[in-house]
Structure formats: C-alpha cells, structure tokens
C-alpha cells in the first residue's frame, strides 16, 4: 500500500497494521492533524504595532470576512499568510502563534491574514460547507483573488498584483494553487509542511478524516468525489503552470526529527515525516519540468509545529522584498516595544 510505504522513513520497526492505525491516530489527534498545531485564545502581536482589524464584504460567501492587516505603505505588495486546518474565527494562527506582524513591520510589504476558513483549503467548494457548527458558504478562492484584493486596493492602497501567498500545512498546497491559477496576483508562493499530492493514493480519504475531526466537514462537499477538482487542486499535477508562470517558490519541509525548537510529540513528528515524501516528489517534478525559480528548504530536522514554520517565514523576508519590489521602511509609524 502506497500510504504505508510513505511512513517507512518516518516510523521504522512498526508492524504494518500498527502503522495504518497510527495514521488515523495522528490525523485525528487534537494536537495537529493536517492542522497547524494547537492555538491559544489571544493574539501574539504586541500593542503598538499598526495592526488593523478589517471586515471585508464578500458577496461570494454572503458575509463579512475578518482580516488582520498591517500596511506596508502606499502601493505596497502584500503577503497573504494563510492558516492551517484548525483556523479559528477570532485570530489568524500566524498571529496567535508567531510575531509575524513584528517580523514584517516596516518591511515595505503589507501583511494580510484572513481569519476563519477551518478545513477550507482556501478553495471554492462545490457544496455548502456543513460541519459541527452548521452550514456556511466556502468560496475562499474567489474571495482571495477577487473581492479581497479589490477591497485592499481601494481602501488600503495595496497593489492588486505582484503579491505573495504563504501557507502552512493545509494552506501550503493552497498557496501553490493560487499562484498556479492567478499568476498576476501571486507571483510568489510559499508552502510549509504541506501535502503536495492531495489527489494521489489515499490523500482524499485522509483529508476527509482530518476535516471530519477539524470541524466535522466532508471532503466530498469541497471537491466532490475523486476526479477533476481534486486534480485541479493538486500542486504536484500543476507544476507545469507554476514553471510556465515563472512563479517564485519557497518550499519548506522538515524530516520529522525535533530540534531545540520543540515539537517533540508523536503526531508532529509522524506527520512531518509523512508529508516530506510528497515534497520530495514535487521537487523532482518541478526540476523535471524545467523549473529554476524555487528555494527547496528541506532541513535535516523539523516537525509539524509552529516554530518550524516561523523560521522559513523569517528567512524568506529578503527574498520576498526583492521579488515583490518592496520598499523597506515604508508603512505607518510604530510605537516602540516596552522594555
């Protein structure tokens, strides 16, 4: 079974039946799943940062969508930081778990953090998204590529083109798909610890299990049964578009071994070892298609946890500024941090 073969590098010496059972245990764990770790109830960003809380109308989704926003100055490009499977309705996980606003303050890049979208893959769903909390409309791709950039251009002087999408876990594949199909808006895409071949092997079944645990959603409501929509949203099958677009890519994945950054728990170690295989396959496909505009950051450590996703977002800052043509120092004044 292909699924079990993936784990031989992540978990050794484990009988076949126990390995299969461990898959379900890891995916249904309250710790991570394909989720992006656990979260606290308050934001990380310190008082004094010029972070705004916007309510952006979405006709496609029939409601206002909360956006956490930090301006990079007039006519600045944007960095869309996309959340994991367990995205909350109060704050974006990047603000809950990292000082990302601090890292990019005065960078010349506007930081855009959509709030909500649990289990959504930031996609336009075939059917209403029905879960434990009831039913809602998920048209996230339409919102991110049409409604939100138009709002930010009109109200916050953010360029509607030439921006970046970076996502962790669930949203890593989403960022690549956004760049594949919307190359003018997203010239840069970053994927951190994502499953990059979701339509392959048992991908749809495992994603369905994880979505059921993270909100009670059904994968069939998202992209239907196996078929064209799953393939359309599979980065490993859309490599040709990314190469043809000359999208700038940053692909990160650890190997399931913890370092001093933490994440030393079985689900975090197991999941990172699992998704690494799809990342290596994506790199092979990208190189085979003639790609030459990507950073592949495959560390000899790293588990499925926030400290390992914060590190590459800091590391790619200069590359983002150069690629997007940002003007460092632009943006609203910031109060100094207290000692």
UniProtKB/Swiss-Prot annotation:
**Primary location group:** secreted
Taken from the UniProt record, the cysteine pairs bridged by disulfide bonds within this chain are 130-135
Q: Which Pfam families match?
A: Esterase (PF00756)
Q: Which cell locations does it reside in?
A: Secreted, Cell wall; Cytoplasm
**Catalytic residues in the record:** 169, 272, 304
Q: Which UniProt keywords apply?
A: Acyltransferase, Cell wall, Cytoplasm, Disulfide bond, Secreted, Signal, Transferase
Where along this sequence does the record place binding of substrate? Answer: 85-86, 169, 197, 274-277, 281, 304-306
Q: EC number(s) for this protein?
A: 2.3.1.122, 2.3.1.20
| CC terms in the record's Gene Ontology section | cytoplasm; extracellular region
GO terms for molecular function, please?
diacylglycerol O-acyltransferase activity; trehalose O-mycolyltransferase activity
- Please give the InterPro entries that the UniProt record associates with this protein: AB_hydrolase_fold (IPR029058), Esterase-like (IPR000801), Mycobacterial_A85_antigen (IPR050583)
Q: Which Gene3D superfamilies match?
A: alpha/beta hydrolase (3.40.50.1820)
Signal peptide location in the record?
1-43
Q: Which reaction does it catalyse?
A: an acyl-CoA + a 1,2-diacyl-sn-glycerol = a triacyl-sn-glycerol + CoA; 2 alpha,alpha'-trehalose 6-mycolate = alpha,alpha'-trehalose 6,6'-bismycolate + alpha,alpha-trehalose
Q: Where is this region: Fibronectin-binding?
A: 101-111
Subunit organization: Homodimer.
Q: What does this protein do?
A: The antigen 85 proteins (FbpA, FbpB, FbpC) are responsible for the high affinity of mycobacteria for fibronectin, a large adhesive glycoprotein, which facilitates the attachment of M.tuberculosis to murine alveolar macrophages (AMs). They also help to maintain the integrity of the cell wall by catalyzing the transfer of mycolic acids to cell wall arabinogalactan, and through the synthesis of alpha,alpha-trehalose dimycolate (TDM, cord factor).
Among PANTHER family, the record links this protein to: DIACYLGLYCEROL ACYLTRANSFERASE_MYCOLYLTRANSFERASE AG85A, ENTEROCHELIN ESTERASE-RELATED
Q: Which family does it belong to?
A: Belongs to the mycobacterial A85 antigen family.
Name by which UniProt lists this protein: Diacylglycerol acyltransferase/mycolyltransferase Ag85A
Q: What species was this sequence derived from?
A: Mycobacterium gordonae
What gene does the UniProt entry assign to this protein? fbpA
């Amino acid at each position: 079974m292909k699924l079990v073969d993936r784990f031989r590098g992540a978990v050794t010496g484990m009988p076949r039946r126990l390995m299969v059972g461990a898959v379900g245990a890891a995916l249904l764990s309250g710790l991570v799943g394909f989720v992006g770790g656990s979260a606290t109830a308050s934001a990380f960003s310190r008082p004094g940062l010029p972070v705004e809380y916007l309510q952006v109308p979405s006709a496609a989704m029939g409601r206002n969508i909360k956006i956490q926003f930090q301006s990079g100055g007039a006519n600045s490009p944007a960095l869309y930081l996309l959340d994991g499977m367990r995205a909350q309705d109060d704050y974006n996980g990047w603000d809950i778990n990292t000082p990302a606003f601090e890292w990019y303050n005065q960078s010349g890049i506007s930081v855009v953090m959509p709030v909500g979208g649990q289990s959504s893959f930031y996609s336009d769903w075939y059917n209403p998204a029905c879960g434990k909390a009831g039913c809602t409309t998920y048209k996230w791709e339409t919102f991110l590529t049409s409604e939100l950039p138009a709002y930010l251009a009109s109200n916050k002087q953010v360029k509607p083109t030439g921006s970046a999408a970076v996502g962790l876990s669930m949203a890593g594949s989403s960022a690549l798909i956004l760049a594949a199909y919307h190359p003018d808006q997203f010239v840069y895409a970053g994927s951190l610890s994502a499953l990059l071949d979701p339509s392959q092997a048992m991908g749809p079944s495992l994603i369905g299990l994880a979505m059921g645990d993270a909100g009670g959603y059904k994968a069939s409501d998202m992209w239907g049964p196996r078929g064209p929509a799953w393939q359309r949203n599979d980065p490993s099958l859309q490599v040709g578009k990314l190469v043809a677009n000359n999208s700038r890519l940053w692909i990160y994945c650890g190997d399931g071994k913890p370092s001093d950054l933490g994440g030393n728990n079985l689900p975090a170690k197991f999941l990172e070892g699992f998704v690494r295989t799809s990342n290596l396959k994506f790199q092979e496909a990208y190189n085979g298609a003639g790609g030459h505009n990507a950073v592949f950051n495959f560390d000899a450590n790293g588990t499925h946890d926030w400290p390992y996703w914060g590190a590459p977002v800091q590391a790619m800052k200069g590359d983002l500024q150069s690629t997007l043509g940002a003007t460092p120092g632009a943006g609203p004044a910031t109060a100094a941090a207290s000692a």
